[in-house]
């Protein structure tokens, strides 16, 4: 059995930063294996991302450009190599993040590893998101990071009208 793919999603917003890690097995549900929260400071986030990449060179890392994301990306020395992505969508284009989460929750396509310290905060963020998809309050960085971690980052299927 092959090792699961590992995705790390990095988000910084006005209320703080988050890194969410999800493992993608060859078959079955994705598992959120880590939820890390940070103050609104690029330095510790950059150091953690560098450590994650050093520990798992084959992992995929996506950085949200909003908030301090552009600065985090810059401090990571523009990692425009395989396994890195800067998520640069703004405004209405970001609604896809909500869609990804709502579909994943409804389909139960991911779960949480047992004992995650921030799992309850994540669940509160998800409830807030389902009530108000444009919410920008505390915890919204968790929901955005989760969406980026569980999305496969392929172009969306064409819409049929």
Which stretches of residues belong to each language-model region?
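RNase H-like, metal-dependent nuclease domains and their acidic two-metal-ion catalytic environment used
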Residues: 1-87, 95, 99, 109-161
């Amino acid at each position: 059995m092959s090792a699961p793919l590992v995705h790390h999603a990095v988000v910084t917003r006005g209320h703080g930063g988050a890194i969410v890690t999800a493992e993608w097995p060859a078959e079955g549900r994705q598992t959120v294996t880590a939820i890390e929260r940070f103050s609104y400071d690029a330095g510790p986030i950059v150091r953690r991302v560098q450590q994650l990449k050093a520990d798992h060179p084959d992992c995929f890392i996506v950085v949200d450009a909003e908030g301090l994301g552009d600065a985090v990306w810059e401090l990571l020395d523009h990692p425009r190599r395989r396994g890195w992505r800067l998520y640069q969508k703004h405004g209405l284009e970001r609604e896809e993040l909500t869609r990804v989460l709502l579909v994943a929750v409804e389909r139960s396509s991911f779960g949480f590893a047992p004992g995650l310290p921030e799992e309850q905060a994540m669940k509160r963020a998800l409830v807030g998101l389902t009530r108000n998809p444009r919410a920008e309050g505390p915890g919204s960085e968790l929901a955005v990071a989760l969406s980026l971690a569980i999305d496969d980052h392929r172009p969306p299927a064409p819409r049929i009208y």
